[in-house]
Amino acid sequence: MPNLYLVSLGCNKNLVDSEIMLGRLSSYNIVDKPNNADVMIVNTCGFIESAKEESVRTILELASYKKENSVLVVTGCLMQRYRDELMKELPEVDIFTGVGDYASIDEMILKKQNLFSPGVYLQKSDTKRVITGSSYHAYIKIAEGCNQKCSFCAIPTFKGKLKSRDINSIIKEVKELTKDGYSDFSFIAQDTSSFLRDAGINDGLIKLIDEVEKIEAVKSARILYLYPTTASMGLIDKIIASPKFVNYFDMPIQHINDDMLKIMRRGSSKERLKELLTKMRVAPKSFLRTGIIIGHPGETGERFDELCDFLTEFKFDRISAFAYSKEEGTLAYEMEQIPSKTITKRLNTIEKIIKKQIEGSFKSLVGEVIKVQINGSSSEGEMFFGAKSIIWDREIDGEILINDTQIKDPKVGEIYDCKINEFVKDKLIGEIICNS
């Protein structure tokens, strides 16, 4: 059996594509090091400059491990976006492919053939996946592409317009995964709240929630990547009322100043954002995550200060901050740019605010009893089990450490009542009270 080594870079949407490729390559032995791999695959990210640089570094690193008759495959967003340039500049690569042919990866390797189908690959209900990183949680991609026209984002130029999966296809996938023991699901897309708008249906997520709630084996679920102009009050109400979907609200705002929101072509206003966020915040046991961009063209010192003030006053649980990246094919590319030193200085300022906000969110749980799921061994070694709040996403929201002597027969994915005792060095420490 030949050995396969795969590196998945970028977002969890890329991870799903990688898992689809692993499903097509089930006849290979998956290895965790490239040294003895017969086939190496890099699923690249092409979103911002730092991601592009990481992708190229990874490709060149894996090329150094090539042996006689081994195959190096490069796929994903970077490849789709810079097809001609990369094929010319990377002679080390044996097979090039973009974002439309993940389900044909086995044939490409067999024939040692490049393949670039028009459009993106849209997952089908019978698509096989090898879920990685968890035995109880899975990401479910509900759409591809994006109809938004944000000034800074190049994704629509290589992913195309919104293409939603059929609800029946999604529900069939979830049902099949529950048969394999999966009970916790995160629904993802570039803009989840636009789901089914390409079919003329507004609030398609409400229809999806209705169907997921009928699946008894689903214990918990959440929706990531809401977009401010397509996330309705009705959708928020539906999530709050749902017995399956937790009150997890992930909505990147990118900025709060009205002038900046117009320049960035976000389609929303400060007033509308505050209205949505407040409704999310006051929901019982709600968890709010957002993302912001620092240094976009047009961001004056005064506009940046307004963002800082808002992030200081409004209580988010998690905030991801990104330095603006000048990307070809975007409106912002042609705008007057802000000096990199200014962007770095502003990013350092905002990160101090974020650190304080996140610490406050963690500390608010000390003394509380919350429901957690066991992930397995912790990042701190064998003395602790790692767990997460049932509300949190699997990978990005943190870890709760639990002494391994407190659970006689721990089951990964099992839900427990946990009392949070301490917050130490970005980690919560808790004790299991009972099986929930």
From Swiss-Prot:
Its main location: cytoplasm. It comes from the Bacteria. InterPro entries: Elp3/MiaA/NifB-like_rSAM, Methylthiotransferase, Methylthiotransferase_CS, Methylthiotransferase_N, Methylthiotransferase_N_sf, Ribosomal_uS12_MeSTrfase_RimO, rSAM, rSAM_horseshoe. One of its GO terms (cellular component) is cytosol. [4Fe-4S] cluster 1 binds at C11, C45, C77. GO terms for molecular function: 4 iron, 4 sulfur cluster binding; aspartic acid methylthiotransferase activity; metal ion binding; protein methylthiotransferase activity. [4Fe-4S] cluster 2 binds at C146, C150, C153. It catalyses: L-aspartate(89)-[ribosomal protein uS12]-hydrogen + (sulfur carrier)-SH + AH2 + 2 S-adenosyl-L-methionine = 3-methylsulfanyl-L-aspartate(89)-[ribosomal protein uS12]-hydrogen + (sulfur carrier)-H + 5'-deoxyadenosine + L-methionine + A + S-adenosyl-L-homocysteine + 2 H(+). Residues 2-114 form the MTTase N-terminal domain. Residues 132-363 form the Radical SAM core domain. It is found in: Cytoplasm. The keyword 4Fe-4S applies. PROSITE patterns: MTTASE_N, MTTASE_RADICAL, RADICAL_SAM, TRAM. Its cofactor is [4Fe-4S] cluster. Pfam families: Radical_SAM, UPF0004. HAMAP family: MTTase_RimO (MF_01865). This is Ribosomal protein uS12 methylthiotransferase RimO. The lineage of its organism: Bacteria, Pseudomonadati, Campylobacterota, Epsilonproteobacteria, Campylobacterales. The gene is rimO.
